[in-house]
Amino acid sequence: MMDVVDRSWDMAHRPRVALDVETSLVYGRRILEGVSRYLRANRPWSIYLEQHELGSDLPGLLKRWTGDGIITRQASADSVKQLKRRRLAAVDLGDIHPHLGILRICSADLAIGRMAAEHLLERGFQSFACAGFSGEYWSQRRREGFIGEVTHAGYECSVYESPRAGLKVWKQDQKRLVEWIRALKKPVGVFATNDLRGQHVLDACARENVAVPEQFAVIGVDNDELLCGLCNPPLSSVIPNPERIGYEAAGWLDRMMQGDMPTDSLIEIPPQGVSVRQSSDAFAVPDPVVAAALRFIRERACDGASVQDVLDHLRVSRSWLERNFRKLLNRSPQAEIRNVQIKRCKELLRTTSLSLEKIAALAGFEHPEYMSVVFKRETGDTPGHYRGSNEKEL
């Protein structure tokens, strides 16, 4: 957790800080919310901010700014040289140029890809695909995380990539997307490396009359509620943590303007979880009874449901359920219950300040001590250490 800057430091001087962060995208606005939250708790700055899109030049703000510091999403090798020449405190939040020699704070893209894979694997998918953008570092890293997790589980992954471009290329791209979708083995779980790509994929599915999510489950990234809601069906999405990125960036810039330089050149902020919407809300198992068991466990595990409760609900024998779970999912019903409970624990540890006793109750454990034992066994980490490493509020 970042140390809070002493509010008494030179209150007569408000540092002049430029915020070169796009206001046209939800991600950028949430970064600015994190900066704002930091400033409300610490000394104020004199802020220079213009509304603009990612990629606009402002013009040439990075080359012309002569204030005390800058937070930017658009750093380049050339602009960083000039910032260093002027000895200007700077934090880079961009996801295009990864190695510029200044502090970079960004989303943990590998972890985002892994989280998307876990979401689809938990739903029983055994065929996987990834749709991203060529030439985009962040998309490449998310793809790597997704494929790595899928490969570790023993499966392969088909990849579709194309450049980010305008309407003319988009029309050609949609045609190729339809052809790619047509060739995939179904049912298939598809990871789109951002919500915009997820919208492209769902639109292509509609053109091909593919059943979503039963035959083609899709998950994106960014949790842009407007864009996800415009999709048909609504798009599931991995939730990054741009507010924390903004908070961290403001804190580090404040310290740097006081001469405290960071020892690390990269800080990666993990995702918060998955917002499940209709596009991936399905279980890709051929047996309807096993699918019903999975849905029951998802809905009731955190109420304390046991394997016996599953058996009573479905009216099947324990041996039948155990055998078919292992055949179709390669895990036991009890392991599935624990998996759902641990995911709930992680979510509450990351995003709330609730006590372990309260978290245990909300995750379906009778005692916090037993929850801690199970959490340590399943994750290799204690609840307290996990919370300290992943908490949303700093």
Task: Report residues per predicted region.
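Residues that mark the N-terminal boundary/hinge immediately upstream of a DNA-recognition element
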Residues: 306, 332, 355-357, 367, ...
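Bacterial carbohydrate/catabolite-sensing allosteric modules
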Residues: 1-69, 78-307, 311-313, 322, ...
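Binding-interface segments
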Residues: 371
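A secondary-structure capping/hinge motif
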Residues: 325-333, 374-386
